[in-house]
């Protein structure tokens, strides 16, 4: 496996009851997959739980359980997708002063058919930057420049007004 490849296995719980209430069936398969990923990828494999009202009571158990197996335990903040999902976050980590979105600056979210929405938060594809298959990567990437320039100018319109992910980024 290429050394640049890493994998995050989203589990959200270390017990079948909590896992089932969040994700449904499949706890045994998911945890077995996480174990195999750790064995195969070592430090490039991560296990993750999303911190929310649903998981808060089990996070310490999750962390302790997986920390025995790997250093790569990720506790991720809850994402409400610009208020399209219920707000069930436990704490507000939003910076006091708004700044331009890390995702508009660094990320390109490509759907399986090649369409590229404004960002990963645009789950309804309200703003399409283009299609990497028909428009090409450079043209599609360039189509987002105006949105980022708006952010630099302090203008946050559309779904960006409700976004709580602008300050997060993936390494």
Predicted regions and their residues:
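Radical SAM/AdoMet-radical enzyme domain recognition
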Residues: 1-64, 72
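Short, flexible active-site-adjacent loop segments at beta-strand->alpha-helix junctions, enriched
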Residues: 11-15, 51, 79, 114, ...
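C-terminal accessory region of radical SAM enzymes
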Residues: 33-35, 39-46, 66-91, 96, ...
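Short, small/polar residue-rich loop motifs at catalytic or cofactor-binding pockets
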Residues: 102-104
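Short, acidic, Ser/Thr-enriched surface-loop or helix-capping motifs
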Residues: 110-111
């Amino acid at each position: 496996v290429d050394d640049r490849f890493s994998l995050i296995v989203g589990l959200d719980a270390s017990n079948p009851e909590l896992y089932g209430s969040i994700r449904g069936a499949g706890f045994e398969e998911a945890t077995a997959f996480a174990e195999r990923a750790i064995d195969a990828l070592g430090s490039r494999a991560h296990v993750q739980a999303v911190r929310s009202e649903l998981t808060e009571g089990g996070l310490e158990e999750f962390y302790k359980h997986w920390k025995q197996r790997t250093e790569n335990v990720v506790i991720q903040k809850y994402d409400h997708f610009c208020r399209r999902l219920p707000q069930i976050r436990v704490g507000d980590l939003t910076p006091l002063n708004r700044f331009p979105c890390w995702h508009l600056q660094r990320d390109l979210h490509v759907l399986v058919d090649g369409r590229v929405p404004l960002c990963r938060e645009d789950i309804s594809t309200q703003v399409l930057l283009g299609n990497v298959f028909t428009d090409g990567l450079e043209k599609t990437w360039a189509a987002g420049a105006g949105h980022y320039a708006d952010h630099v100018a302090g203008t946050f319109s559309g779904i960006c007004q409700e976004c709580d992910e602008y300050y997060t980024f993936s390494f």
